C-alpha cells in the first residue's frame, strides 16, 4: 500500500490485469452463449443447456440484440401492396385529396428514382451502398427529366388540389416540371441555382448546368462572381450536418406557413428520417386531434407510419398514375422545349464559359448550346452533382474511423 492509503503502482497494474482478465472471460462466455443459441434446442448438449441456464442475463441480452437486428432488417425491406389492395388505398387517398382544404406534399428521393437518380436508403440507395463499401453511381444527373410524379404534382397544384410542395431533393426537377417557385420549398437546395449573399436581397442565378462541381460540405463557393457586386457566388445546397440559412430556394417561411395551415399532408418517396427532425413541418405544438392527416407513399418503413391515416406500399409513379386516373385528371408529358429553366436562367458572361465542365441543358438534345464548354452529350462516364453523396461519404468515413 502506498503512503497515504492509496494503491501502489504495482497494485494498480495488478488490479488492471484482473479487470482485463474478467472482461475477456465475459466476452468469451458471451461468444459461447451466442454459438449455443444459434443451434436448435434439440441439438444442444446437456452441458450447453446448463451454461445457458447459468447465463440468463447474457441470453436475454443476446436475444434482445437479435430482435433489434431483425427489426432493422424488416424496416429496410421493400414491401409492395398487391394491385387490388393498392387500388383500394388509392381510392381512399383520392377521397382525401378531394376533401382536403389545404393539402401539402412532402417529397423525397423516391420520386426521382424513375429519372435514374438513386434514393438514399433503398436497396440500391446511396446510404445503403456506402454502408456495404460499394461504389455509388448514377446516370448523368443533367440527363434527368421530371418524372410522372413530378408532372402529376404540378397538375394537382394547377387544379388547386395541392397548395404547396416541400422537397428534400436537390435535383431541381420540381422547378423544371413547371411548378411555380412560390409553391416550392427546396429545403436542401437546388443544383441549378447559385446566389450572391452580399446583395440584399440575395441575388439568384439560375443556370442550365449543375453549379456544384467545385463545392462540397462546408465549401460552397462556385468560382463565379455576382454580375452586380463582384462577390463570389455560392451554391444553395444543404449537406448532411449543415443548417440551411438561405431564403431561396429553401423557402422555409412558406414551408412552415403551409404546414401550419395544412389539414392533409401527402408524403411521397421520403424515408422521413430527416424530415421527422423538423418539428415545424409536423405541427407538433397542436393537440393530436388538430394535426394534419398524414398519407405516406413508400416501399419501406418510415418513422411516421404509426401516425399515418394511410400507408401505401408502392412506387410513386404507380400510385400517382392511379391517383390521377381516380381524380379524372390528365398527366402532362414533360416537354423539354417548355422547360421553365430556360426562361429563368441567367446566361454566363464573356469569359465565364470555361468556369464549369458540366454538361449544360439544352432545348434540343441534338446540339449543345452556343459556346458551351461542358462535357459532350455521349460522355461515357456518369457525371454526378458536386452535392451527390458528399455528405454521406463524409459520414461513412467518420463511422469507419470510429
Curated annotation (Swiss-Prot):
GO terms for cellular component: chromatin; cytoplasm; nucleolus; nucleolus organizer region; nucleoplasm; nucleus; site of double-strand break. The modification Asymmetric dimethylarginine is found at residue 390. Phosphorylated during mitosis. GO terms for biological process: DNA damage response; DNA repair; DNA repair-dependent chromatin remodeling; homologous chromosome pairing at meiosis; negative regulation of gene expression, epigenetic; negative regulation of phosphatidylinositol 3-kinase/protein kinase B signal transduction; negative regulation of protein ubiquitination; negative regulation of transcription by RNA polymerase II. The keyword Transmembrane does not apply. Residues 9-25 have a biased composition (Basic and acidic residues). One of its GO terms (molecular function) is NAD-dependent protein lysine deacetylase activity. NAD-dependent protein-lysine deacetylase and deacylase activities are activated by nucleic acids. Histone deacetylase activity is activated by DNA. Protein-lysine deacylase activity is activated by RNA. H3K18Ac histone deacetylase activity is inhibited by methylation at Arg-390. H3K18Ac histone deacetylase activity is inhibited by deubiquitination by USP7. Binds 1 zinc ion per subunit. Its main location: nucleus. Its EC number is 2.3.1.286, 2.3.1.-. NAD(+) binds at residues 108-127, 168-171, 269-271, 298-300, 316. It is an enzyme of class 2 (transferase). The keyword Transferase applies. It comes from the Eukaryota. Pfam families: SIR2. Residues 83-330 form the Deacetylase sirtuin-type domain. It catalyses: N(6)-acetyl-L-lysyl-[protein] + NAD(+) + H2O = 2''-O-acetyl-ADP-D-ribose + nicotinamide + L-lysyl-[protein]; N(6)-glutaryl-L-lysyl-[protein] + NAD(+) + H2O = 2''-O-glutaryl-ADP-D-ribose + nicotinamide + L-lysyl-[protein]; N(6)-succinyl-L-lysyl-[protein] + NAD(+) + H2O = 2''-O-succinyl-ADP-D-ribose + nicotinamide + L-lysyl-[protein]; N(6)-propanoyl-L-lysyl-[protein] + NAD(+) + H2O = 3''-O-propanoyl-ADP-D-ribose + nicotinamide + L-lysyl-[protein]. Keywords: Chromatin regulator, Chromosome, Cytoplasm, DNA damage, DNA repair, Metal-binding, Methylation, NAD, Nucleus, Phosphoprotein, Repressor, Transcription, Transcription regulation, Transferase, Ubl conjugation, Zinc. Interacts with UBTF and the RNA polymerase I complex. Interacts with components of the B-WICH complex, such as MYBBP1A, SMARCA5/SNF2H and BAZ1B/WSTF. Interacts with ELK4, leading to stabilization at target promoters for H3K18Ac deacetylation. Interacts with histone H2A and/or histone H2B. Interacts with DNMT1. Interacts with SIRT1. Belongs to the sirtuin family. Class IV subfamily. NAD-dependent protein-lysine deacylase that can act both as a deacetylase or deacylase (desuccinylase, depropionylase, deglutarylase and dedecanoylase), depending on the context. Specifically mediates deacetylation of histone H3 at 'Lys-18' (H3K18Ac). In contrast to other histone deacetylases, displays strong preference for a specific histone mark, H3K18Ac, directly linked to control of gene expression. H3K18Ac is mainly present around the transcription start site of genes and has been linked to activation of nuclear hormone receptors; SIRT7 thereby acts as a transcription repressor. This is NAD-dependent protein deacetylase sirtuin-7. It comes from Rattus norvegicus (Rat).
Amino acid at each position: 500500500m502506498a503512503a497515504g492509503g492509496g494503491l501502489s503502482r504495482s497494485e494498480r497494474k495488478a488490479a488492471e490485469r484482473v479487470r482485463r482478465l474478467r472482461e475477456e472471460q465475459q466476452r468469451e462466455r458471451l461468444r459461447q452463449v451466442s454459438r449455443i443459441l444459434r443451434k436448435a434446442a434439440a441439438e444442444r448438449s446437456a452441458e450447453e443447456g446448463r451454461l445457458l441456464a447459468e447465463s440468463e442475463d447474457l441470453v436475454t441480452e443476446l436475444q434482445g440484440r437479435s430482435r433489434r437486428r431483425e427489426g432493422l432488417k424488416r424496416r429496410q425491406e421493400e414491401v409492395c401492396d398487391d394491385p387490388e389492395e393498392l387500388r383500394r388505398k388509392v381510392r381512399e387517398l383520392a377521397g382525401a385529396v378531394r376533401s382536403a382544404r389545404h393539402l401539402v406534399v412532402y417529397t423525397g428521393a423516391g420520386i426521382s428514382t424513375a429519372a435514374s437518380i438513386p434514393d438514399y436508403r433503398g436497396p440500391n440507395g446511396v446510404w445503403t451502398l456506402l454502408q456495404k463499401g460499394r461504389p455509388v453511381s448514377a446516370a448523368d444527373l443533367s440527363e434527368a427529366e421530371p418524372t410522372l410524379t413530378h408532372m402529376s404534382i404540378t397538375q394537382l397544384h394547377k387544379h388547386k388540389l395541392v397548395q404547396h410542395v416541400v422537397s428534400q431533393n436537390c435535383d431541381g426537377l420540381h422547378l423544371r416540371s413547371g411548378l411555380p417557385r412560390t409553391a416550392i420549398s427546396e429545403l436542401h437546395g437546388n443544383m441549378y441555382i447559385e446566389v450572391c449573399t452580399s446583395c440584399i436581397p440575395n441575388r439568384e442565378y439560375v443556370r442550365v448546368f449543375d453549379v456544384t462541381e467545385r463545392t462540397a460540405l462546408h465549401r460552397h463557393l462556385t468560382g463565379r462572381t455576382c454580375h452586380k457586386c463582384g462577390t463570389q457566388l455560392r451554391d444553395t445546397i444543404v449537406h448532411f450536418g449543415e443548417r440551411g440559412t438561405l431564403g431561396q430556394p429553401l423557402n422555409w417561411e412558406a414551408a412552415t406557413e403551409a404546414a401550419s395551415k395544412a389539414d392533409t399532408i401527402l408524403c411521397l418517396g421520403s424515408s422521413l428520417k430527416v424530415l421527422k427532425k423538423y418539428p415545424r413541418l409536423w405541427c407538433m405544438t397542436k393537440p393530436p386531434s388538430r394535426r394534419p392527416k398524414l398519407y405516406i407513399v413508400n416501399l419501406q418503413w418510415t418513422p411516421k407510419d404509426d401516425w399515418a391515416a394511410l400507408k401505401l406500399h408502392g412506387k410513386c409513379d404507380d400510385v400517382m398514375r392511379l391517383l390521377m386516373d381516380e381524380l379524372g385528371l390528365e398527366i402532362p408529358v414533360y416537354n423539354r422545349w417548355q422547360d421553365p429553366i430556360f426562361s429563368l436562367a441567367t446566361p454566363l458572361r464573356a469569359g465565364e464559359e470555361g468556369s464549369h465542365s458540366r454538361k449544360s441543358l439544352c432545348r434540343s438534345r441534338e446540339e449543345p448550346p452556343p459556346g458551351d464548354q461542358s462535357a459532350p452529350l455521349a460522355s461515357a462516364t456518369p457525371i454526378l452533382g458536386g452535392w451527390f453523396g458528399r455528405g454521406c461519404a463524409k459520414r461513412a468515413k467518420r463511422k469507419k474511423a470510429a
